[in-house]
Curated annotation (Swiss-Prot):
Functional summary from the UniProt entry: Negative regulator of protease production and sporulation.
Protein name: HTH-type transcriptional regulator Hpr
Short name of any one Pfam family annotated for the protein: MarR
Organism: Bacillus mycoides (strain KBAB4)
Subunit structure: Homodimer.
GO biological process: negative regulation of DNA-templated transcription; response to stress; sporulation resulting in formation of a cellular spore
Domain HTH marR-type: 13-157
MF GO annotations: DNA binding; DNA-binding transcription factor activity
Binding region for DNA: 63-86
Keywords for the protein's UniProt record, in alphabetical order: DNA-binding, Repressor, Sporulation, Transcription, Transcription regulation
Length: 185
């Protein structure tokens, strides 16, 4: 192959891009609806819940990290974090050696809320989970999404995937199931 020559056709690229776009949009519509229904009783929106979750799993983070790992603009991360601070779920701070960045930590009240939400998670009310259940029943496990993870690693970087994996490991290691509810060990 000559330098600058592409090993794919424009048609192939268009079909792949459109497939990903359509599937992502359809999947997001279900994810968004399920997520909103889950957190609605606690007067949270998706960004607020995501920020609480990231702050919990990272044991504190800068606003820039929240934006990066929450896949949101820095101003969105800051504004929603501010609302969570006003409600007593987060605290803001600056580090002595880094006055430029604003850091957040989840408060006890914020952690209690997040843990209550985790306890209240009901897989029966999650359409994506239910859509994948047949695959689990057939193959004995849920899809691992390795191709999707590889694509996201190429877009957002390895540290994005590491944080994503760390949050799942935290749930695996620090939570147990009691009476069909997820509770902290």
């Amino acid at each position: 192959m000559k330098s600058g020559e592409k090993n794919y056709s424009v048609k192939e690229a268009m079909i792949f891009s459109q497939r990903i776009a359509q599937l992502s949009k359809a999947l997001w519509k279900c994810v968004e609806k399920d997520w909103q229904q889950w957190i609605k009783p606690y007067d949270l929106n998706i960004n607020e819940h995501h920020i609480l979750s990231i702050a919990y799993h990272l044991k504190g983070a800068s606003i820039s990290e929240i934006a990066k790992f929450g896949v949101m603009h820095v101003s969105t991360a800051f504004n929603f974090s501010k609302k969570l601070e006003e409600r007593g779920y987060l605290v803001f701070s600056k580090k002595e050696d880094d006055k430029r960045n604003t850091y957040i930590e989840i408060t006890d009240k914020g952690e209690e809320l997040l843990l209550r939400l985790m306890e209240e998670y009901d897989p029966e009310n999650n359409s994506v989970f239910n859509g994948a259940l047949e695959l689990r029943n057939f193959y004995g496990k849920f899809p691992e999404n390795i191709e999707l993870i590889a694509i996201l690693r190429n877009i957002y970087g390895q540290d994005f995937i590491d944080i994503f994996e760390k949050s799942l490991e935290n749930i695996e290691e620090n939570f147990t199931e009691t009476d069909q509810k997820l509770v902290k060990k």
